[in-house]
Swiss-Prot record:
Protein name: Ubiquitin-conjugating enzyme E2 W
Record-listed E.C. numbers: 2.3.2.23, 2.3.2.25
Gene3D superfamilies tied to this protein: Ubiquitin Conjugating Enzyme
Protein encoded by which gene: ubc-16
Keyword terms: Ligase, Transferase, Ubl conjugation, Ubl conjugation pathway
Species this protein is from: Caenorhabditis elegans
SUPFAM superfamilies in UniProt: UBC-like
Catalyses which reaction(s): S-ubiquitinyl-[E1 ubiquitin-activating enzyme]-L-cysteine + [E2 ubiquitin-conjugating enzyme]-L-cysteine = [E1 ubiquitin-activating enzyme]-L-cysteine + S-ubiquitinyl-[E2 ubiquitin-conjugating enzyme]-L-cysteine; S-ubiquitinyl-[E1 ubiquitin-activating enzyme]-L-cysteine + [acceptor protein]-N-terminal-amino acid = [E1 ubiquitin-activating enzyme]-L-cysteine + N-terminal-ubiquitinyl-[acceptor protein]
Amino acid sequence: MSDAATRRLMKELAQLKSEAPEGLLVDNTSTSNDLKQWKIGVVGAEGTLYAGEVFMLQFTFGPQYPFNSPEVMFVGETIPAHPHIYSNGHICLSILSDDWTPALSVQSVCLSILSMLSSSKEKKHPIDDAIYVRTCSKNPSKTRWWFHDDSV
């Protein structure tokens, strides 16, 4: 990892640890050992379908971060059922691929995912979940997403 990427990640991590927005939980054990991979908990907002539920996001940073997006996916025993989240934890969200810009941060990605969860009207995986999970790469960054529905 480049020095610039390391400095950027250290700055983002320090900010998250000191000023984590409501609904985000920084897993100190995962982030302190290795800057290349972080785990951050997201807590469903009150008044939403996911109220009080806790889900774990895993961020994996490549050597070109922040010029290339991190690999972001849900991990652990509980993957949220959502029309843009596959049962293997992969997330169909444009800012994780085509719309990524170095101005985005781990915090902004987490808040976008929380917003996506909060606006959902039903708990169900995408209609192509079974096929996708059977045939996809383990790395969600290698998926060529087709963004066709931004209403959830």
